Each structure stands twice: as structure tokens, then as C-alpha cells.
């Protein structure tokens, strides 16, 4: 939070419990570019003061020009270098990185970009499982420093239940993508890779008709995804060390 007392309270709790954390920025949505830039700058500096492992940022807007979004990325990179806190930019609808084909030119021009990869958004935007955008996918994998692990489809950013056999193809593909991100992190000798199982609440999670009851239990599915990723990690390490 921007409020100093609230921020101090949270930071003290994190210190007392010896917790690392990933900070989240999503608030900046101003249409006016100058106001947007100023607010983004303020939020990033505010989060960096808390010394998180990294800041996951919803950066830019899908309707800004390439040059405007590039200016925001350059500013964030300057803040990262100044503070020593990594800033990752989430692949998210409505932001500069809303689609695979529009994110690729930024990755090609700016090698310093770190991504929070959530390809479920890209699948939904492209109305495909991105089988025809392998260049963008492979490039994004190499830039991934943080993973939001949600299983999406060509029609929705979140399948109703990734445990459902009807969603097996989607689950297998996302596990492969996440595995490739982990392999790249190992190959480039990263200190760590952070992952958040992100099966979201409503409106990501659908309600049963005429109720306020979610069709699936959010905690159960995120725990399922966590276990799937852990199993995949073990397999990757065994394969690399065999």
C-alpha cells in the first residue's frame, strides 16, 4: 500500500515471520499517458522499498503506441537498476503484453525485459493454443522469471477444472511450457524461479447458474496445480542429472 503506516505494518509482519514475497502492481490504468507514467513510477518505487524478491507489474496499456509502452518499460528498467529489485512484466490482457504477436517485438528490441508468463491470456486473445506462434512462445520462455500457473484454453483464460479429462490437452501443454521455463532457468543458472498457482476466483471461476456458488474449489485446484508442477520439477531434475 502507498499509506506509510499500512506499509510499515505489512513489512514488519514479513520480517517477523521471515517471509520472502512477490510484490504486485496492477493499479495503474490511467488513459492519459503522462498520468499513467507518473503513477506507475510511484507504485514501482513504493513496492521496491519493501525489498520483495521481485515486483510483478501490469505494465502499459494495449491501446498505447509501441513508443509509449516502450518508454514505460525503459523507465521500469531504470528503477530496477537503481533499486536492485527485479521487475517482471506480466503477459496480461489489456496491457502492452496482451498478445504473443504484439509482445514479441518488445522482447526482440529489449533483451533486459523480464516476464511474468501467464500464457492463458495469450491463448484467449488468439483463440488458439498458440500452435502457430512458436517463435513468440520460445522467445517469451527465455525471458520468463516468474510464472502464473493457470491453465487456459482457446476460449477462456481459465478452464473450469484442469483435472477434467476434457482439459487434458490444455493441461499437458501448459505443463510443457512451465517445464521449458524451468529448464531455461536452470540452463542460465538462475538463483531461483518463482511460481504462483493462479486458479482465480470469480469472474475467472464461473458460478453455477443463478447462484453465487463457484463451480470448483479454488484452493483444491491451486493445490492440484502445485502438485503437478512439483512432480514435473522432479522429472526435469532427474532427466537433467541422468
Predicted stretch roles:
Residues 1, 55-57, 115, 147, ...:
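Hydrophobic residues within beta-strands of alpha/beta enzymes
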Residues 7-11, 40-45, 70-77, 100-107, ...:
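Generic structural signal for well-ordered alpha-helices
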Residues 109-113, 123-242:
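Histidine-acidic metal/acid-base catalytic patches
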Amino acid at each position: 500500500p502507498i499509506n506509510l503506516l499500512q506499509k510499515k505494518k505489512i513489512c514488519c509482519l514479513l520480517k517477523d515471520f521471515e517471509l520472502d514475497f512477490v510484490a504486485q502492481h496492477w493499479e495503474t490504468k490511467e488513459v492519459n499517458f503522462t498520468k499513467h507514467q507518473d503513477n506507475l513510477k510511484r507504485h514501482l518505487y513504493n513496492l521496491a522499498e519493501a525489498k520483495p524478491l521481485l515486483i510483478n507489474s501490469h505494465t502499459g496499456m494495449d491501446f498505447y503506441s509501441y513508443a509509449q509502452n516502450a518508454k514505460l518499460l525503459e523507465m521500469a528498467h531504470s528503477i530496477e537498476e537503481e533499486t536492485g529489485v527485479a521487475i517482471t512484466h506480466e503477459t496480461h490482457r489489456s496491457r502492452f503484453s496482451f498478445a504473443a504477436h504484439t509482445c514479441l517485438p518488445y522482447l526482440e528490441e529489449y533483451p533486459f525485459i523480464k516476464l511474468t508468463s501467464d500464457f492463458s491470456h495469450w491463448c484467449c486473445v488468439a483463440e488458439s493454443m498458440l500452435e502457430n506462434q512458436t517463435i513468440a512462445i520460445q522467445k517469451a520462455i527465455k525471458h520468463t522469471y516468474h510464472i502464473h500457473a493457470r491453465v487456459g484454453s482457446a476460449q477462456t483464460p481459465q478452464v473450469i477444472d484442469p483435472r477434467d479429462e476434457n482439459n487434458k490437452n490444455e493441461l499437458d501443454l501448459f505443463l510443457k511450457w512451465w517445464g521449458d521455463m524451468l529448464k531455461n532457468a536452470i540452463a542460465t543458472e538462475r538463483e531461483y524461479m518463482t511460481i504462483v498457482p493462479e486458479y482465480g476466483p470469480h469472474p475467472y471461476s464461473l458460478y453455477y447458474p443463478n447462484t453465487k456458488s463457484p463451480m470448483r474449489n479454488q484452493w483444491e485446484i491451486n493445490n492440484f496445480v502445485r502438485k503437478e508442477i512439483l512432480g514435473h520439477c522432479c522429472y526435469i531434475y532427474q532427466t537433467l542429472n541422468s
